[in-house]
Amino acid sequence: MARNIKVEELLQTPIEKQRIELVERKGIGHPDSISDGLAEAVSRALCREYISKCGTVLHHNTDETQIVAGRSSPKFGGGEVLQPIYMLLVGRATKEFEGVELATESVALQAARNYLRKTMVNMDLERDVIMDCKLGTGSSDLRDVFKRDRVPVANDTSFGVGHAPFSELENIVYNTERRLLTDLKSRMPAIGEDMKVMGLRDGEDIALTICSGMIGKYIDDLDSYINMTQEMKIYVEELATHYTERDVNVYINTGDNLKTSCVFLTVTGTSAEMGDDGSVGRGNRCNGLITPNRPMSMEATSGKNPINHIGKIYNLLSTQMARDIVKQVPEVQDVYIRLLSQIAKPIDQPLVASAQIIPKEGTSFEKVKSEAEVVIDDWLSNVTKITEMVIRGELNTF
Amino acid sequence: MARNIKVEELLQTPIEKQRIELVERKGIGHPDSISDGLAEAVSRALCREYISKCGTVLHHNTDETQIVAGRSSPKFGGGEVLQPIYMLLVGRATKEFEGVELATESVALQAARNYLRKTMVNMDLERDVIMDCKLGTGSSDLRDVFKRDRVPVANDTSFGVGHAPFSELENIVYNTERRLLTDLKSRMPAIGEDMKVMGLRDGEDIALTICSGMIGKYIDDLDSYINMTQEMKIYVEELATHYTERDVNVYINTGDNLKTSCVFLTVTGTSAEMGDDGSVGRGNRCNGLITPNRPMSMEATSGKNPINHIGKIYNLLSTQMARDIVKQVPEVQDVYIRLLSQIAKPIDQPLVASAQIIPKEGTSFEKVKSEAEVVIDDWLSNVTKITEMVIRGELNTF
Amino acid sequence: MARNIKVEELLQTPIEKQRIELVERKGIGHPDSISDGLAEAVSRALCREYISKCGTVLHHNTDETQIVAGRSSPKFGGGEVLQPIYMLLVGRATKEFEGVELATESVALQAARNYLRKTMVNMDLERDVIMDCKLGTGSSDLRDVFKRDRVPVANDTSFGVGHAPFSELENIVYNTERRLLTDLKSRMPAIGEDMKVMGLRDGEDIALTICSGMIGKYIDDLDSYINMTQEMKIYVEELATHYTERDVNVYINTGDNLKTSCVFLTVTGTSAEMGDDGSVGRGNRCNGLITPNRPMSMEATSGKNPINHIGKIYNLLSTQMARDIVKQVPEVQDVYIRLLSQIAKPIDQPLVASAQIIPKEGTSFEKVKSEAEVVIDDWLSNVTKITEMVIRGELNTF
Amino acid sequence: MARNIKVEELLQTPIEKQRIELVERKGIGHPDSISDGLAEAVSRALCREYISKCGTVLHHNTDETQIVAGRSSPKFGGGEVLQPIYMLLVGRATKEFEGVELATESVALQAARNYLRKTMVNMDLERDVIMDCKLGTGSSDLRDVFKRDRVPVANDTSFGVGHAPFSELENIVYNTERRLLTDLKSRMPAIGEDMKVMGLRDGEDIALTICSGMIGKYIDDLDSYINMTQEMKIYVEELATHYTERDVNVYINTGDNLKTSCVFLTVTGTSAEMGDDGSVGRGNRCNGLITPNRPMSMEATSGKNPINHIGKIYNLLSTQMARDIVKQVPEVQDVYIRLLSQIAKPIDQPLVASAQIIPKEGTSFEKVKSEAEVVIDDWLSNVTKITEMVIRGELNTF
């Protein structure tokens, strides 16, 4: 059956030429990101458990972790968590299959604790965290849906959106958090995983406001703190030059009051230890960013089952489509994908697959159009590839 | 101090002329909307309690309700909830003020139960719901921030977005849910508050897919069910003619299987009774819609304190600004507002207040620009009016 | 099959002649008693639900309610609960029977809330209490056990104990709480349901220490409070004369400090509102008392299923046996019953039914022995009568 | 001030001469014992934390752990926990002292997890357990009470009871559990910590019914299981000969059905993994036993603060007194101690310290009386020694 693919030319100021652009990324230790990470870790663990015990992924959605902040008393050279952070894993999972009972809650709990241990390296799981779990069973037996001999049908009437390529600012914001945590942190362990990078481009001026929960035990005193944030600033300024020729100003922890030594210190690297709650789906979209100048979906990508949940698959898929179109069709300036499902229809047959394309100046939209259609159609023909990539952990969801 | 207001002309296909447009609204009984509603009801109740006991609103944010679905056994003519829906109110609140202890948790609990009783009229609060509450104290004493003799300073570096006017599709989607619940429901009590209206405009064709959890006890049998959904369809089709001349097709509960009598029935009017979890900030934006063709903010508006939380105030404010610009500047076709705060700066002095305007064909952007600037500047001068409107319950947040 | 009934003469100073006797009763509003009451109310409601839906009582045990105290700010003439009391219903219940799903959690929740509303008349269930529920399924399907065509088999190797008659002090302590709450409270609503009556008999002197959480809203001021406790004292002194000719001294709220107005006030009538946690099985035994001069069982009677749970049935049964022996065999001074079950054996065939009897002076033990055996044997032959009395609510469990 | 010590002669059949005697011990892995152990571990950790941070023990009571059973699928050679056991630590603790905030919840959580890891060696804390914690603050600031320059005053009007010496049956029951777990288990790791030893002496015949949750992964098959329980039986029979010359019959897991291979297997060593809930204070008294032929107190000893909580101190103290009297006064056959406090009076001045003594045949009660009084008075003079022993972990509480 032919797919309903609609590629149209978008008449719009391309993002780089718009006057104001806003981009945000929450670091992996932000309470909302921790929630996303836990939700996705649990879903992946369930997928593996289901495959191992039942030969196929069974119905589940674990996209609702709630984090209730603790209390802490951070200090230079030490500090402690006073009241543990409470983390509640929430969702649905199939608990029985052909007479076999499945250890869904235990698997979820273990996966969550493992994820946290790997991600939040300064969190003491024995005393800083209460990990709770409420997994219900689903609304019905979707076993048939999950059979792999045909394309699954959509769980809902819902949509996903994606765009490409990243703007300069998007690249800077994304990589600032990534490089601070994967590169600079290796020699400056005081950098906390809870980070918020807010980028504002006003014409040709870029301002990066970084809020980073520094880890007290690695910092001797205020001087040391000032030196570190200064080094971070220089690091980010240098990093930005790889992505832009615009002026970039970097501001770190602007809420600090150095006179009163009231600075952004943490014990564990996340503000969830002290007053900041978190939940799934309220932070980064699946491309790793929050981009109010771009179309976005409200659907949480993390934690949903990767078999038939449109809120996950179509967000990931549209992002892959957009990136491939940009890669394979050089005349594309900006592309926006929107995929809309209809409940109970095969997921390779969306109600509409819409692409809006801004061609580069001087290029023909018609050529672009047909090439983009091919990319979209190919991806839809291979939609279950997204499922496999998710299970293998090859696609980020936040 | 002069404000940093940037009004630019946006070169873009106006929304009504884009080929594909998607708009969604989750009804007030959708698990995500219930979460939003509870969060906001709690915040309003705390505001009133603080004013009554302390003369001023104190620091709080209660924007993190988590709903864990129950289990139910719906039936024509009856049905019952088997396992109660678990609702966890989460957030921060000031519990002591000048030596007086405040009943924050009790106030929150009562407000939440009252809200639910009023909103979900078929839910039996004695047996269908477990209402739990975990309110911590905040990260620091923000009392100074909340003094009313000067403009509060921003709690965070964050942004809000808004647009106006509503497109035809936006109007249809929004009013479909509103009128079904406020008008048709008065004579057809079987309509559940949990509704999802998904609108797709493909050129001149509009498809409305409505998913509505019907309430079993008001429906005798399958025939009766079919008659009711048919009546709803006719009602919505007629309603749509008030907003558009385009073709409108309405689809209700397309997931139903009439042969097996497997239809979307509920006991209480919400799918939270059976398998659908919910949380704050994952549904409608503060204008009541999810609009992937429009800029959106990821910030949850519901439950945040209305004094200095940018994630609430700037989303509400930018929407008001956009609506007033459209009202006062007739040459404006579409306007998009983005307000970006800087932590610890007065909220009437955003880092940038950006407006992107598509003028109507044949009008002068320059005239529009200056008039829009006046509207924006006026609103910023009167920013605390938003606070007052929130406390009085005059602004919806979802 | 002949039953293993062992009646022996006990050579022991009868209770009334022992020098020191201690007796305690916790009022129905004591946090431990509330837990007991909730547990039993839930079990009764489940019994009724099972009978109504399945024709027979199914396996359940709900004997583990946990109460976590709230915070309150009591005052003369008013006061309020600041943080709700958290009550967690815990236990096991059969959730499915021959394909029918049963509303166990909803039934439990409703029963608990109803019980609380009736028992704690000054508690506002909308804001003073969070009622939570965690009912698992049992360790195995005990359906066969619950068939009514034969005597059920014991769920465990366990025992129950009972004695009769009540001593003077036991009568006084028991009736003090009962009459204060059922009689005096009707004209003095300030008496809280949370009461602890501690009786000490030292030879011929009886001291009753009563700790009673008075309800602030019914008391204007300290003078009024003093008058009320004085009236209570007089009331109890008069009451005691119905049971003893010994000297009785009554002390009420001896922890009060009248100079600092630091007295035992509550908002709701129970100290669970402020600092006193509670759980099942830690207060009164099933005869309503705690009696360290008498044999006791550690088994919680409340909340266990009345079909085959020895910890419930044998405690109730041995108390009934003891009372009937005293009633029917006038030569008995004191009798102590101990019933020991063996797991998986019919409950009318205890491993041993032991009676220790102190005959009245000058009477023949042999006559007493055979008459007591008959009472015991009769009760064992009609053991399921206990089950029926429990379900009908005719037997107290605390 | 002279103390109110009352030593009386008890005319009573000594325990060894009573016809029927019942004694029970719950093993350290029984759900009720785990609750006791967690509660006491938390209290000890808080004592140490308070001393380390504040120089003195501050007010706390953590005597209310609630265990909600999980689900498991035990097997010979393996098995797994399907749903984690939920453990809720409940109590009160001082969270602030002279401006210093104390990490009470974190300390509690860590202590609980450590205790569990050491006690339940086959429990995987990463996936088998959810450890939750709700510690409130107390009803008032008892700091003054806790000053060490004078004897603390009683927190309540309450009592403790103790007796000595152990009867033969008490010794057998107590040591059966102890030796199985500390000696035989070292070469038979399949013995689970969840054990219930029920002893019945009927005249000269002793029956020990042992219910022991065997650990599947150490047992190959049913034959192996049968061999092990047989070896346990022989071990206990031999052990009993050290304490009695009476006939002892040992029954292990009499609920097993060998034909259907339905035997008492566990994954973790405790039935809390599958259907058995638990809570503090419902199992062993502080002497390690449940003894319905002896006076008992209902007060939970575990988890209460060891400074002024009568429910803890007087139970431990009366047991120490009884044991010392037996040791130092050889003419004592049986001694029963009851200590009754009065709220707000120094704990070395009980309202009454009652001893009931059965002297050995042919000995003078008068001599015994005065010697016993000395022991009692000495202990009361040194009552705070109990506190120190508790903090140092030298006294068991269950």
Swiss-Prot record, chains A, B, C, D:
GO terms for biological process: one-carbon metabolic process; S-adenosylmethionine biosynthetic process. ATP binds at residues 136-141. The keyword ATP-binding applies. Pathway: Amino-acid biosynthesis; S-adenosyl-L-methionine biosynthesis; S-adenosyl-L-methionine from L-methionine: step 1/1. GO terms for molecular function: ATP binding; magnesium ion binding; methionine adenosyltransferase activity. Keywords: ATP-binding, Magnesium, Nucleotide-binding, One-carbon metabolism, Transferase. It catalyses: L-methionine + ATP + H2O = S-adenosyl-L-methionine + phosphate + diphosphate. It is an enzyme of class 2 (transferase). Its EC number is 2.5.1.6. Pfam families: AdoMet_Synthase. Its cofactor is Mg(2+). NCBIfam families: PRK04439.1-3, PRK04439.1-5. Catalyzes the formation of S-adenosylmethionine from methionine and ATP. PANTHER family: S-ADENOSYLMETHIONINE SYNTHASE. Belongs to the AdoMet synthase 2 family. This is S-adenosylmethionine synthase. The lineage of its organism: Archaea, Methanobacteriati, Methanobacteriota, Stenosarchaea group, Methanomicrobia.
